[in-house]
Structures are given as structure tokens and as C-alpha cells.
Amino acid sequence: MIKNEQPPLSFEEAMEQLEEVVEQLEQGDVPLEEAISMFQKGMNLSKVCHEKLATVEKQMDQILKEDGNFEETVLQEEQE
């Protein structure tokens, strides 16, 4: 891992940060330039959450496939 590179966020961490961004933007007292930056951060966090949910959905489908036989296969998390 590169020095400045942060480890990937968990779903819960991304949701918490996204909720904070939304709350700040909803207050409406953020300068325009900062609001645009926050909006972009929120969109990125939303993408992280969506990707993690999609990965979990694929794992659940894999577990429940083939006539209800419970067969778990761990899938690699999709990377950009």
C-alpha cells in the first residue's frame, strides 16, 4: 500500500460519512465551492456503498443457488 493511500472503507464507514455529507449539505450554509466538493465526495461514497451491496448480493445468490442447496463461495470484492 502506498503511504498516502488509505485502506478501503467498510460499508458502515462509507454510510456514516455519506450521512454526514448529506446532513451538512441539507443545512444549506456551505459555500458553493465546498458544496460541490462535498457533493462529489458523497457521490463517491454512494458508489462505494453500491459496490459493496452488489458484492454481498452476488455472495447471497451464490449461497442460495442450485435448488436451495446452501453452497457458499466467497467472491473477490470488485476493484476499480
Swiss-Prot record:
Its EC number is 3.1.11.6. One of its GO terms (molecular function) is exodeoxyribonuclease VII activity. Disulfide bonds: none annotated. GO terms for biological process: DNA catabolic process. It catalyses: Exonucleolytic cleavage in either 5'- to 3'- or 3'- to 5'-direction to yield nucleoside 5'-phosphates. It is an enzyme of class 3 (hydrolase). It is found in: Cytoplasm. Keywords: Cytoplasm, Exonuclease, Hydrolase, Nuclease. Pfam families: Exonuc_VII_S. Heterooligomer composed of large and small subunits. Belongs to the XseB family. Bidirectionally degrades single-stranded DNA into large acid-insoluble oligonucleotides, which are then degraded further into small acid-soluble oligonucleotides. This is Exodeoxyribonuclease 7 small subunit. It comes from Halalkalibacterium halodurans (strain ATCC BAA-125 / DSM 18197 / FERM 7344 / JCM 9153 / C-125). The lineage of its organism: Bacteria, Bacillati, Bacillota, Bacilli, Bacillales. The gene is xseB.
